[in-house]
Amino acid sequence: MTGSWANALWETAPRAQIEAAATARVLQVIGDAYQRVPFYRWFYERAGLRPALLRTLADVRREVPFVTKADLLEFQDAPGWQALDQAGVRQFHLTSGTSGAGREFHVRDTEDLAALGTGGAYSLLWAGLRPGDRILLTIPYSQTMAGPYFQAACEAAAVSVTATICR
């Protein structure tokens, strides 16, 4: 954090630089997902999408379909549906199933867990919290990923956390 900026490089960059970086990264993620994740290869092919033909964010908005819960549930039982090498898995999560439409299964590796709080840290800093501030975290840890997410966000923002146990 520099002054009032969480990341001065990107928060003060010219719009064209931000858009160019975002475009490159989005296209890379879509291409990597197609190459590495059986679910996305199946999903994109079913939609007739060829990621190599995407060039702009406008192409992405126009051509890339949204993934629905029904899509995830349809493919979830297929072998190898996730991109992670199972040896690298550090955490497993199920959704709560409150929608009644089945439960989604999610896995996270060390890199996922290390990056977990980064986005949340920005929101805390943008909301006015500063390193050394204290926060009382009352989100249940045992029920959802929200508790660990907010804890990681506070840690990434260097905000002190007091967590309560809520059941």
Predicted segments with their positions:
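AMP-binding/adenylate-forming
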Residues: 110-122, 134-167
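Short helix-loop-beta connector
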Residues: 129-133
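Nucleotide 5′-phosphate-binding alpha/beta core
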Residues: 1-118, 122-126
